Amino acid sequence: MLTSSGERKANEDFLDVLISSDRQDFILCDGLGGHGNGDVASRFVTETIKEALKKEMSVEESIMEAQKKLLEKQKAEHAENSMKTTVTCLELSGSKAKFAHVGDSRIYHFEKAKYVQRSQDHSVPQMLVNRGDIKEKDIRHHEDRSRLLRV
């Protein structure tokens, strides 16, 4: 897994791996630093997903469980406008791969000597691409490239 602080001073990413005899789960959360407590959110969501996966919940169920618990934590700590994170979770089992994500932390597949993006960002520019308003090549430099629709 690759993480980078980008233009920010601190990297608020948190990642973990869960390995069992029949599968491997990889969890990556990228805390939103501009909202405060992104590091808290990324650690909390990663740990919550890991615990849910240990209970044999699916990747999707684990993310929903983490979202529910993060919302409860935000409310309890009066932090509804902070403690935000993206999440990407990949499960490998035999020759099968499943993933789920929220935000703009991407999943790529290395295929035929090149990387192929498998996930689609939950961002304003991606929405504009989907509507046909801009081209995919314009996402990288779009003024709203960091504006997410889901976190």
Positions of the model-derived regions?
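PP2C/PPM-type serine/threonine phosphatase catalytic domain
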Residues: 1-151
